[in-house]
Amino acid sequence: MTNIRKTHPLLKIINNSLVDLPAPSSLSSWWNFGSLLGVCLGVQILTGLFLAMHYTSDTATAFNSVTHICRDVNYGWLLRYLHANGASMFFICLYLHVGRGLYYGSYTYSETWNIGILLLFAVMATAFMGYVLPWGQMSFWGATVITNLLSAIPYIGTELVQWIWGGFSVDKATLTRFFAFHFLLPFIVAALVMVHLLFLHETGSNNPTGIPSDPDMIPFHPYYTIKDILGFLVMLTALSALVLFSPDLLGDPDNYIPANPLNTPPHIKPEWYFLFAYAILRSIPNKLGGVLALVLSILILTIVPILHMSKQRSMMFRPLSQCLFWLLVAVLFTLTWIGGQPVEHPYIIIGQTASVLYFLILLVLMPLTSITENHLLKW
């Protein structure tokens, strides 16, 4: 008798995606992050759902409702900090996942890659709107500063900002709509994840060598399910340690002060996972130029497949490209650090240099290095 998982219409889909899926035998731990992101999304949706049961999206009560969750709701503090720090884990996994794709040439699967970039934008939008909900000082001023950037768009900018705000400033209408979108977007993200996996399973997974692995495949279960479970345990241990020992490590103390439109915090900055983009935004003196650079810092990923000049797919056997890749990582760390610093000398010039380097590496140096490597190998 044929196993039910191979005949049942619904179980058949799950089976072909998670059990009998042929996977390359050489996948390293860098391929764990896709499943880790799935776990992060699940944790965020569950904790978010329970938080939404107690949260009120009204400017008069939002801050107090978050305090109420932490003090009066059973394990409310745990839910709140799991959700806040879960977002940080989400972005750590997300950036490592994208980095893996860049290093091993996974971007040559253009449909999967482009849906991935769309997912990145959706998750960033969700995180931004979620940061506004506790209605602390940094929530309010972060929302004001970031939404105000849209006013740089010629002709329609000012009207667009007021349309998003639902008034002439960030107020009750803004908070209510941000809560609505913050609740809705994760489910759109979950749907996009399904499309992402659909495209991935059309082509099959890439592997560290970048060489087609059709003759050497193994079933996903039990080999990679066990490997993924180990990844889950490591990540959940790290998340638990963060939540239970230093839950506010990655947050901003200003967000424990209720939002006050009359009092601006000394340093307005987003959460750590947006600091690299924020540093790029601040490094350009012109408002519209800064906004364009901010958007392009992520959108640049869409043209990476076009700029792939190497005859090899992966960077595994390309030492010159590897050096550039790790330089790019160093530049991103530098930008993240600069984004959290005040706008003064020498941080301004460091930020500008790092921003120029970021675009230079991706647009010019990497393609040139690939061409050089092709010539060195007489290809």
From Swiss-Prot:
GO terms for cellular component: mitochondrial inner membrane; respiratory chain complex III. Keywords: Electron transport, Heme, Iron, Membrane, Metal-binding, Mitochondrion, Mitochondrion inner membrane, Respiratory chain, Transmembrane, Transmembrane helix, Transport, Ubiquinone. InterPro entries: Cyt_b/b6_C (IPR005798), Cyt_b/b6_C_sf (IPR036150), Cyt_b/b6_N (IPR005797), Cytb/b6-like_sf (IPR027387), Cytochrome_b (IPR030689), Cytochrome_b_C_euk/bac (IPR048260), Cytochrome_b_N_euk/bac (IPR048259), Di-haem_cyt_TM (IPR016174). A ubiquinone binds at H201. Pfam families: Cytochrom_B_C, Cytochrome_B. GO terms for molecular function: metal ion binding; ubiquinol-cytochrome-c reductase activity. Binds 2 heme b groups non-covalently. GO terms for biological process: mitochondrial electron transport, ubiquinol to cytochrome c. This is Cytochrome b. It comes from Sturnira erythromos (Hairy yellow-shouldered bat). The lineage of its organism: Eukaryota, Metazoa, Chordata, Craniata, Vertebrata.
